[in-house]
């Protein structure tokens, strides 16, 4: 068999340089010397007969060839990690690692409950939770870096033939108001009342905002006419802003359980409008599925439904 033109260690070095932007920082992150990093890069460039890095500027940037190699290198390294986890499963079915992905709201307010149930049943299995945008989570599932994910948005179009999407539960969305707002005296408001509110909104690219806009549009309510007081990228920041009487907001009902119990926020229903989004389980059927992932899916997800949140008052 001919010698391979590069090693796994060399791929890790190239990945570190791309992430850190310099040979020295890459060396520090890998706990090896800078000359060792330089030598490994020179060796792989010599073996492949291509230049992988542009060393002309202050930052070490990948060339087109470097980007191409790293794209395949990420897949190779992910497959190696997958292999190790499969062997770990084979050695002992009661141990291992479960890597879960979730979009922002789901990861913050739902996943801790699910992970707690799983850890009580399987304390030997280590759980890693990755919280990111729906798009990034789906790509990590596709690449084998995440075992199983729960998302509240749609899978990217380019991944729909690769990933398996299973409906899981409904996530009700709530219109929240400061308790001092005149509308807080009502359990239900009219559609026209929305145009009188000042809104604290999630960024336009957020899943919840897209879902709310689409549902409202179906009821002939046009969010483009809303007065947006400010945009924030954090549900916690939005809740704080609403409590500070800066405006109203749409959030997941799962995020306001404590605030409703303590009377810190008011949940106003909109007449004849139901605000729900679908939560889905995302897996990659073409990747190895660990025993830990099977247990989480079959024993935890199958038996647990997110608790229903009710407006107080």
Swiss-Prot record:
Assigned keywords, A-Z: Chloroplast, DNA-binding, Plastid, Transcription, Transcription regulation
Signal peptide range in chain numbering: none
DNA-binding region: 23-42
Places the protein is found: Plastid, Chloroplast
Predominant subcellular localization, coarse grouping: plastid
Keyword Transcription: yes
PROSITE patterns: HTH_LYSR (PS50931)
Entry protein name: Probable RuBisCO transcriptional regulator
InterPro entries: LysR_subst-bd (IPR005119), Tscrpt_reg_HTH_LysR (IPR000847), WH-like_DNA-bd_sf (IPR036388), WH_DNA-bd_sf (IPR036390)
Coiled-coil intervals, chain numbering: none
One Pfam family of this chain: LysR_substrate
Gene for this chain: rbcR
